[in-house]
Structure formats: structure tokens, C-alpha cells
């Protein structure tokens, strides 16, 4: 059974007499443990897809299943539990608490995730064992992004959702961050979903979903995806 299924999902935003169809009857499925890239230009519907899968928004029409459960039918309280237990988020900007140390930032998830990994373990995975007691202001942009990845993964989510995770980074640091995400997909069996407009990142994916004007244009499985080092920026 796929870990994710979208079935005829539409999302329509209404403002006065105006309707905007951000997604139009979208259907696809994803298997567990895949590295997935949702690719498309600005305004294509990529972020709407991510928000729906993350339980941050609900569809106007259609069904969304995660591990066989219809999350489109969940109440607000149930969606909060879903966000806490099932999905992790990594954004383009790091959203770290400046007054907390690196370790303390990662430990924040212990308050909401019952099966959280130890902060030290996740920070070791992202190569930051030597920075446990540093504050975010003492880190580079790439290091801060790796802290945000460690924090998201410390929740032990089934699915990690990433919105342009390397968008604010230089190419060398971006490759480093993508290597970490690939490693987590392979070593922990996590399903990684990245939203991006960068076509080069799509070359690394097991599955590429191309979105345009709120519709799925194609879903492509890549038998031999490139490594992060092979991708030209």
C-alpha cells in the first residue's frame, strides 16, 4: 500500500466573488522510503500540495490518504496530532529559536513527539556533534539548515516535507544539505518530499512530480537518480 495517495484533490480559494483553483483534480501515489521532488514554476500549486500533505490545509474536494488514513476527514485537533506524529517540516528559512542552543532547538520536538529520537543522535547524523552548545547566530547558513533538518527528523516522522530547503544557500552548501536529506531517506526509510523550481535537484529523485497550473503534468520514476555531487547547479 502506498504511504501517500491523492485522489481527485482540488483546492479552491475564494475571495469575495473571485475563485482561484490552486489545484485541479490532482491524483498520484507515493511509496514509502522514496526521495520525491515536486517540480514546477512559481504559482504552479507546489506549495499547496505540500500544505495539504502536511495537514496545514484541507482540500476543497477529493481525498488524501496517508498510511491508509483519510487525513482530509480529520478534525483540527486530529490534524494537530497528525502534524506532531507523522510529518516533519523543513523550510527555506530555518525558523530556529535564537535564544536556544543547537541541542535545545532540536529538543523542542520532545514536547510534541512521543517517539522522538535523541537530539544528540540526529545532530550527529547531520554532522553537528561539535556544535551542540552553540547558538544559531554562531552558525553558517548551511549549518543552521542542518539544525532544522535534525529537528524535523528528531520527531521520527514518516514523511519529511521540504519547501525549497537549499533555496537560500550557495551551491556547495546546498549540495551538503541535499546529501543529508538523501542519507536520511536511505538510512531511516523516511519518505522525503521536496518542493522546488530547481530542475537540477529533480535529477536526484526517485520520483519526480511535475506540476503546472494546478495540475499534475507527469509523474516520472527514475531508476538511476544522480547523487548530489553529480548534479550541476
What does each of the following model-derived ranges do?
Residues 215-233:
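Conserved beta-strand-loop-alpha-helix hinge in the C-terminal portion
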Residues 2-211:
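ABC family nucleotide-binding domain
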Amino acid at each position: 500500500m502506498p504511504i501517500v495517495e491523492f485522489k481527485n484533490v482540488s483546492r479552491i480559494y475564494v475571495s469575495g466573488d473571485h475563485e482561484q483553483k490552486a489545484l485541479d483534480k490532482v491524483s498520484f501515489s507515493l511509496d514509502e522510503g522514496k526521495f520525491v521532488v515536486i517540480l514546477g514554476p512559481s504559482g504552479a500549486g507546489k506549495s499547496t500540495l505540500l500544505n495539504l500533505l502536511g495537514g496545514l490545509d484541507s482540500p476543497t474536494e477529493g481525498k488524501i490518504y496517508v498510511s491508509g488514513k483519510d487525513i482530509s476527514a480529520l478534525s483540527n485537533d486530529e490534524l494537530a496530532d497528525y502534524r506532531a506524529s507523522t510529518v516533519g517540516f523543513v523550510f527555506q528559512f530555518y525558523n530556529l529559536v535564537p535564544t536556544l542552543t543547537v541541542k535545545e532547538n532540536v529538543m523542542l520536538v520532545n514536547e510534541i513527539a512521543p517517539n522522538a529520537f535523541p537530539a544528540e543522535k540526529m545532530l550527529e547524523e547531520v554532522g553537528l556533534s561539535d556544535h551542540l552548545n552553540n547558538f544559531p547566530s554562531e552558525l553558517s547558513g548551511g549549518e543552521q539548515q542542518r539544525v532544522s533538518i535534525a529537528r524535523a527528523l528528531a520527531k521520527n516522522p514518516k514523511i519529511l516535507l521540504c519547501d525549497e530547503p537549499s533555496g537560500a544557500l550557495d551551491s556547495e552548501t546546498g549540495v551538503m544539505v541535499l546529501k543529508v536529506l538523501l542519507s536520511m531517506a536511505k538510512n531511516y526509510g523516511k519518505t522525503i518530499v521536496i518542493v522546488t523550481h530547481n530542475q537540477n535537484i529533480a535529477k536526484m529523485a526517485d520520483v519526480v512530480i511535475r506540476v503546472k497550473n494546478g495540475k499534475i503534468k507527469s509523474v516520472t520514476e527514475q531508476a538511476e537518480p544522480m547523487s548530489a555531487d553529480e548534479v550541476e547547479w
